[in-house]
Amino acid sequence: MNVQQTQQQQAMAAQQQSMVAQQQQQIAQQQSAIAQQQIAQQQQIAQQQQIAQQQQQHQQHQQHQQQHQQQQQHQQQHQQQQHIQQQQQPQQQQPQQQQSQQQQQQHQQQQQPQQQQPPQQQQQQPPQQQQQPQQQQQQQQQQQQQPQQQQQQQQQDQLSGVTGKIRDLNESIWIHLGGYAESIGEQDKALASYENALRHNPFSIKALTQIASLFRIKEQYSKAAEYFQRIVTIESKNGEVWGALGHCYLMMDDLQKAYTAYQQALYHLPNPKDPNLWYGIGILYDRYGSYDHAEEAFTAVLKMDNKFEKSTEIYFRLGVLYKHQGKYDQSLEYFQHLVKNPPLPLTTSDIWFQIGHVYELQKEYHKSKDAYEKVLKDNATHSKVLQQLGWLYHHNPLFTNQEYAINYLMRSIDSDSSDAQTWYLLGRCYMTQQKYKKAYDAYQQAVYRDGRNPTFWCSIGVLYYQINQYRDALDAYTRAIRLNPFLSEVWYDLGTLYESCHQHTDSLDAYQRAAELDPHNKHIQSRLATLRAQVSGKPIGKDGYDLQNGEHGEHGGKSTPMIIEPNSPGTGAMESLGKGGQNNRNGNNNGNNSFVPELAEINSHLPEDMRNNSSLPSSNELNSSLIDRKTERGRGEDMHNSHHSQYSNSMSMNNMNNNNNNMNMNNNMNNNMNNMNNNNNNMNSMNNMNNNNNNINNNMSNNNNNNHNNHQMNQYNNNNNNSNINNNNNNHHNMNDNVNSKNNDVLDRRYKGILEREKTSPNGDGRDNRDNIRDNRDNRDSRDGRDNRDGRDSRDRIQEYTREYNNNNNNNNSISSINNNNNNNNNNYNNNNNNNNNNNNNNNNNGLRATSPLPSHNDRRSYERDNKERINNNNNNNNNMNNNMNNNMNNMNNNNNNSNISRFEHQNNRTSSPFENNSNNNNNNNNNNNNNINYNNIGQRALSPQSSQHKDRREIILDEESDINERSKTRSPSIVKEAEEKRETVIVDKERSPTPIITEKPDEKQVEKVTDKESSLVEKVDKENEKESPSSSSSSKEIEKETEKEKEKEKEKEKEVEKEVEKEIENDKEKEKEKEVEKDVEENKSVEKSSEKPVEKESTTTTTNDEDEEGELSEPTTTTKKDDSSKLPTDEKKLSSVSPTTTAVEQSRDETKELEMDTKEDSEKEKKSSTTTTAAASESVKPIDEEKKSPTTTTTTTTNTTTVEPTHKDKESSKNDDTTTTTTTTTTKSAKSPNSSPTRSDEVVEPHQDASQEEINKRKLEDDITSTPSKRLKPDSTPSSATTASTPSEQPESPLKKENPVGETLSPEIKDSKSSSSSSSSSSSSTNTGSSSTNSSAKNERDRDRERERERERDREREREREREREREREKNKQPTRAPIKPSSRKLER
């Protein structure tokens, strides 16, 4: 059957072609005949034109002849007149008659014109008579030409008739050809034939209508409308053309012109019941949103013609209308009727999509999901179905899954990236995940594609509101209201914005406007009732509570804004649907959207991993970006690619923080291992040295002691490491708690002065303070958001907490690195502190950037730039920590090696007794162990629970000012001059004083006696240590009782010190005058006594250091040291006259007063400490900065000068020159009183916490004037050695601990030089000195331990007081003032 049909069709096509060929032949014959006729007519016309030309030439020749004859006649007449005038004049012979004749002639001449006129007329009459026959001739000629002209007109009429027929024939031929081409389906050839027809007749209505209909079929509605408009100008009463024109305007979205065209069609049509016309009118009403009128129009079409060609399309549109009207059952009936016969160009998948959406609106989510999945089986890239499934997984409470929702939406974007609705829904999904940066990017893409959708701007305002950018939220809400002021949701969101800033009057206005637009919304009504009750102060009933937003009014948390539901798909007209059924129209439908479940309430503060996402560009930047859409597609691709990857910047930041923590732990472990290795090396070196000297017994005792010390050191280090980790965690939790408690204050104060209206939040009685707010406006920068106000803001408090938090963490890190520095010198210690300070600064910047409120006018690129800065800062911190660790390791290794080498060389150069070797080893080991304990104590004290708390703001300021003042001291020109003068005086003393060198060897017998006594003393010391060790674990209650008593004494002591400081400032001027006189007197005495007999001077070690890394000059330091093995008879008066420097007298006067107070306190403390000791003694020991001096019964003086070359140079610090040291040993004779006790060099007299800044400045001024050691540091010698001058180098205190002055710590080089000098001097000592030195050293060590324990207790008490004051300040600052919002909602209505 199919073959026969095809054959028949082919035969029919062949017949049609033959018919067309015959018609073409006939048309060609007709055209040839018409062409021959035209040629003949043209020849006739040419002949007639030649004849007419000949006749015209003949007539012109006759006219020329007549004109020539007339000219000749006129000349003859003129000659005759002249002859007559000559004859009329008489001859005048007589002179008398001449006058009369002249008069007469004049009279005649006057009369001549009158007399001559008639003859002239007579003369003129003949030419007129001659012209009459000429006119007659012309008339005759014209009469002869009239038949010729008539013939010509007749011929022209015939020609025009022929040409018109030819045009009509051509027009009809081209129209027939166009119709035939259109029937075949070749629309382009049909258009060309119709245009050729218009060339022959530009007013051909048939050709114009056919061209317009073809353009309408091609959906080129603009061109179709042009041709229909040309037809209407020709025939203004054509109703069908008006209807077609209205349909074209409807497809062009020009609804107003479409409406007027449909009106003209109804007026001019003879029968207005045209189904096509009412079909177009129904679409027009659908576009306007008047669904009732559209329903009437579509039902009227079906009544007019049951078999209307677009009936299925009308069923589809009625189903969509019923869905919008809420008639879901009727809508499902129409859609199910169309499943088997969908209207073109729709498919069954599009119908199932609409069915699934209806089920979704009925909240039958499982049926809806099944319908959507059916669509995906047929078409896996259906963009609208993927969009709706993503939204279903987003808001459906039964199977909510944001990851699935985002996945479906991204697939929808892959298939159709131009749909703004999909980008909008993607932003909503990111909002629920609190990924605000991604949500912002998605909303931005939606606004790029549809910038006049108020729904998008409302959601952008909600985004800004959630991240507390209130100004930008206000801008977005106002933009949405300008686009559509009849959305109740936007007004409600605006009310929540006002309410969050406690501007209740404006909030009430916004809520009232929302209630007017949506009076049936219970949520708005309840919120309005609760707010009115809060303003009026009336109690709120159960019905007035807003459970979703908190039951405690404004203290229950900020209310959550209402979100507008996105428009349903498929609401547009049928012509807006593409091949796949995608509807890209996102109209708002006049606010007929329903509410959806609100977002969960988000805390005002963000977690650490989300803080980088909180800083977004402002609404102004978003508005400016809409103008430039060059990067629209690129940004969409970037957004799509960023979905499948995490934020690399945030991950890198977290990795950097983890690396820092790991490095800190590794540093602590390495430090412990290095400490153990160093101690083992010391033990090995001691064993080798003792084996060489054949002293097995002494070696065993030393090894036991060292093992015991090493075990304690390992315990200290382990405890310190554990406390490092615990305190870091505690600080972290404390910091989070502080930020959480203060965040609400920041949010309210940060945006003070947002709106234009100057209002304040109402007080308890509901009154406004509008005048006061004008004085409290913020002059803040748009970038960093800093408040320039006199009072302390909550933002300042958060900055302080972050700074303290970072300082504590960095201090812990620096302490863990300091535990490794057993033998570091002063320069290395300062370098480590400087590096730690750099780390503090970098981390402070990072902390402030993370926790500060969001700026309202950030650059879009600031987020990437901030990430780069954070990464660079972390890299710098890691490099600094690595450098510190390497420097510390190198210093330890070099110092240990140098010490071993120097000892070995010293033993090989001379023969020493076993006692000397043992004493050297003991001294060296004590130095190493004491230094280790010193640094461990520093770490433990800094890591104590009290120190982990935050510092007070006042203390931070004082610390910063003290550091600045001390640095300015070292750089001041006055101190530089004093340093030069001291150097000159030291050089002069060296030249004057003779320095005899001792080369005698000790007797072997005396040495053997001393060794026996020494071994017995060592055993006693061990026993005492064992007894004291269990007593060190006393209870903490006894410690607190002792600290309370000591606290009262310290207060009294501090008051006395303050009084003394005031007195000393007044006496400074007098002392300066006395200095000059005393210098001259002392110099004269020293010269005279040195000439009488050589006196051996006290050992002074002066070191001149170059500038350190920071370029600060350090003064030459002089330190004194006793040699217990030396004994020479001297007198105090002689020693007072042999002072090596000029500042001895000043120092003695300043120190005597303080020493008297110290001796009294120490005597009382010794009694208490003998019975009970602190528990902290078993865990940590106070650092030993210098050896103390004790009273002895006999005194000896020896002198020895050596020049020591530097043995080690730090890689990081600046290279120092050769240090010249002069060492002399002295011992003074003094009576041993029961009240006397050794002084403490490391004790610091700190001012009370309530001490004013003026008192601290006075002490600093005093230090500058007198150039003596700071009054905060106690003297380093006893009253008996007051004349021994010491000028410690003034250096800035460590930021970790103020109580450990850097100027008093000894470098490894100096310690080695001291140990060598002590060993050299011991060769000339006697046996008695050994016994006395051992007794004094044992007592001194006990005293030192007791003093250290007391100082620890004092530190703990001070920190407790600081904590109490902080708690008081926190209670005062719990209720900060709220910030107002300025412009009212009433201005937005304008």
Curated annotation (Swiss-Prot):
Gene3D superfamilies: Tetratricopeptide repeat domain
GO molecular function: chromatin DNA binding; RNA polymerase II cis-regulatory region sequence-specific DNA binding
Keywords for the protein's UniProt record, in alphabetical order: Nucleus, Repeat, Repressor, TPR repeat, Transcription, Transcription regulation
Example GO BP: sorocarp development
Major subcellular site: nucleus
Subcellular localization(s) per the UniProt record: Nucleus
Per-repeat ranges for TPR: 171-204, 206-238, 239-272, 275-308, 312-345, 349-382, 384-419, 420-453, 454-487, 489-521
Entry-linked SUPFAM superfamilies: TPR-like (SSF48452)
Factors inducing expression: Expressed at the vegetative stage and at an early developmental stage, although at a lower level.
Region (Disordered): 53-143, 539-596, 632-938, 958-1390
UniProt feature, compositional bias: Low complexity: 582-593, 644-744, 805-846, 872-898, 917-937, 1170-1180, 1192-1203, 1219-1228, 1277-1289, 1315-1337
Composition skew (Basic and acidic residues), residue ranges: 540-557, 632-641, 745-803, 857-871, 977-993, 1000-1029, 1037-1099, 1120-1135, 1147-1169, 1206-1218, 1240-1263, 1339-1374
Compositional bias ranges of the Polar residues kind: 1136-1146, 1229-1239
A GO cellular-component term linked to this record: nucleus
Function: Acts as a component of the trfA-tupA corepressor complex which is involved in the repression of many genes in a wide variety of physiological processes. May also be involved in the derepression of at least some target genes. The complex is recruited to target genes by interaction with DNA-bound transcriptional repressors.
Subunit relationships: Associates with tupA to form the trfA-tupA corepressor complex.
PANTHER family given in the database record: LD02225P, LYSINE-SPECIFIC DEMETHYLASE
Similarity comment: Belongs to the CYC8/SSN6 family.
Protein name: General transcriptional corepressor trfA
Organism of origin: Dictyostelium discoideum
Gene behind the chain: trfA
